[in-house]
Amino acid sequence: MSQENHVDVPRKRIRIDQSESSRNLERNGLEDEANAPSDLSGQKFYMTESDVGIDAFLNPNLPSIDGIIKARFTDFAVFEVDTDGNIVHLTDMEAHDPILSKATGDKETEDAKDSSNQDISNDQKAPSFKEQEPATLPILPNDLQSIIPKGIGNEFIQSLHKLSVGEITDPISLILPENTPPMDKGQRTILHQFIRNNFSGLESSTKGNGTFTVSKTTRKNQPRSRRDPRLSWKALGGEYCHFHLYKENRDSMDCLGKIARLLKVPTRTLSIAGTKDRRGVTCQRVAIHHVRASRLAQLNSGSLKNSTYGFLLGNYSYKNSNLRLGDLKGNEFHIVVRNVITPKEKVVEALNSLKEHGFINYFGLQRFGTSSVGTHTIGVRLLQSDWKGAVDLILSPRPEHTGSVKEAIDLWHSTHDAEASLRILPRRMIAESSILETWSRSGNQTDYLGAFQRIPRHLRSIYPHAYQSYVWNRVASWRIKNLGDRPVVGDLVYSTESNGLSQKSPIVDPEAPDLLEDLPVSSKLSARPIEEDEVNNFSIYDIVLPLPGRNVIYPKNETFDIYKSVMNEASLDPLNMSRKDRELSLPGDYRKLLVRPENMEFNFIKYDNMEQQLILTDKDRLENRSISVSSEVGKHTAVTLKFVLPSSAYATMALREALRTATASGDQRMLMPAVLKDSI
């Protein structure tokens, strides 16, 4: 590591005093998090931090801060930071597709080739025409509305849609009322372009008598210059339309699925660099193959205030490549902590400590799912080749189950009727549905491996990766508690050869299993142990810990004993991570032990009501809205934070270090009723 980039921690050592830490934990309901609600059997309704190895602080001597995070979804805003360091915002919702000239090989009569005519998998079937949502059907350009009556125009567009999706096969013609002058060449060009941009697989032409006709495109009747659709995409700038996705209180994958259904394309045509939190306001980049900006812009419903889908699209551009998981530098967070009653000087002390020293780079609770049964516990069974145990956990009754989910799971356990249970179970329960459907078809309810393998491959991969994260969390807690905040001999750092980049391995986003990418594993060693004569050349911020795998090395000190001890609890061996099943033969990876927020700033504001919005969103800015807040006047106090984290770090873990507050959603919900009552 170069000395000019080296930043050492202050010489004043942060004292690891577990007795004081325990008092802070107990005061906030974090000690063993035993206060988490449970059902009559004692099973907790949700996982807590200690369940997944999160039980240490970098600076445990700081006081706790009483406050609530994510009280409103607008209290948690996330903006992607692209690979060039630009913060991604939604600033322009207009599509600016140019009309292509004849020089590109396009003529007045041209097919409308795009990816909309690709096959759609069964679970992504677009609605039939009668089910089609109004926002998916385009409207005629303004230049044509003056000559084509509204009723005729609407009927023509509906016919175009039916022809495009195959509900009708005969060519259609645009019949204008008598005494209506024929369209001139410019108007016909606009109409050709409109059809090309909005409907797939159609060819429009003007006959000698002036009749405008549209038919299904056949390769046979395409001019040679137009058989290669890349000609027009090249003129636009590339085959991939990149855009910014702004969403409110929705999952990234949920939004992508909705976009795919509305456009009638497979979800695989869309790509992102990473998912963003559901409960929040977020903006990120998305790329889609062979769909033009003008089609995407139709999904905005024409109104910011009446966006029916919970998301908006904009900032369109065309590029020659898609996005891959990890194609970002990080994320910028804007966070509100409400109902802060801790003295201001204590809050400032805690936040300055976070700013200066950072936090333990734990995998947050999101990594382990939202259920009371963590994905890592299923991962253990898989690594043990205990297929029955894994399947039983997936189908286990859980205290948080309600409605049709509870009914279906209870029915399965009382009758073992897979077919009847499957009829009740919502399709969104993908893993459970896959298992029951397999058994319903085969009738062999002892084929646990076969049933598990029917779960989509990418979802299956989440389980063993979650166990890796669990082990990492446990070891990180021990490392900070027992070896402190200085490097010691045998700690691992990135090798100069790898330049701080971990070896390539399958990337799994627990919120986006369909986006798992198989990347080649590097043959180069990406980490090395610190030798005795170079300990002073490194700081605690250089230390990395491995995620267990067949291609990693482990610390050359007592930390390795902790890996063995933790994994021995599950009868697993960190030095024996190869498996016959490629999916379970994990290569491993490396992760920084500590992370410091970049560009961190915070402010105190006053407010009167918990429903009051305290930070502006991109949507607010597009609507020219403003928020009136004061630093002096108001019934309650809130703290607003702004900082940037690398893509692999969790903002909730940064907040945990500063606030000493449990970040589990269930713990936060328990704080809400009293606060809401007090705000009335």
From Swiss-Prot:
UniProt feature, compositional bias: Polar residues: 206-216
Keywords assigned by UniProt, alphabetized: Cytoplasm, Isomerase, mRNA processing, mRNA splicing, Nucleus, Ribosome biogenesis, rRNA processing, tRNA processing
Record domain TRUD: where: 358-596
GO molecular function: pseudouridine synthase activity; RNA binding; snRNA pseudouridine synthase activity; tRNA pseudouridine(13) synthase activity
Record InterPro entries: PsdUridine_synth_cat_dom_sf, PsdUridine_synth_TruD, PsdUridine_synth_TruD_CS, PsdUridine_synth_TruD_insert, TruD_catalytic
GO biological process terms on file: enzyme-directed rRNA pseudouridine synthesis; mRNA processing; pseudouridine synthesis; RNA splicing; snRNA pseudouridine synthesis; tRNA pseudouridine synthesis
Record GO cellular component, one term: cytoplasm
Keyword flag rRNA processing: yes
Keyword hit for Signal: no
Domain of life according to the entry: Eukaryota
Catalytic activity: uridine in 5S rRNA = pseudouridine in 5S rRNA; uridine in snRNA = pseudouridine in snRNA; uridine(13) in tRNA = pseudouridine(13) in tRNA; a uridine in mRNA = a pseudouridine in mRNA
E.C. number(s) listed in UniProt: 5.4.99.-, 5.4.99.27
Feature: compositional bias, Basic and acidic residues: 1-30, 99-116
Disordered, as annotated region: 1-42, 99-136, 206-229
Catalytic residues as annotated in Swiss-Prot or TrEMBL: 277 (nucleophile)
Enzyme class: isomerase
Compartments where located: Nucleus; Cytoplasm
Family named by the database record: Belongs to the pseudouridine synthase TruD family.
Role, per record: Catalyzes pseudouridylation at position 35 in U2 snRNA stem-loop II region which induces particular conformation of the mRNA-U2 snRNA duplex and places the nucleophile in an accessible position for the first step of splicing. Also catalyzes pseudouridylation at position 56 in U2 snRNA. Also catalyzes pseudouridylation at position 50 in 5S rRNA, position 13 in cytoplasmic tRNAs, and position 35 in pre-tRNA(Tyr).
Annotated NCBIfam families: tRNA_TruD_broad
Protein name: Multisubstrate pseudouridine synthase 7
Record organism: Schizosaccharomyces pombe (strain 972 / ATCC 24843)
Encoding gene per record: pus7
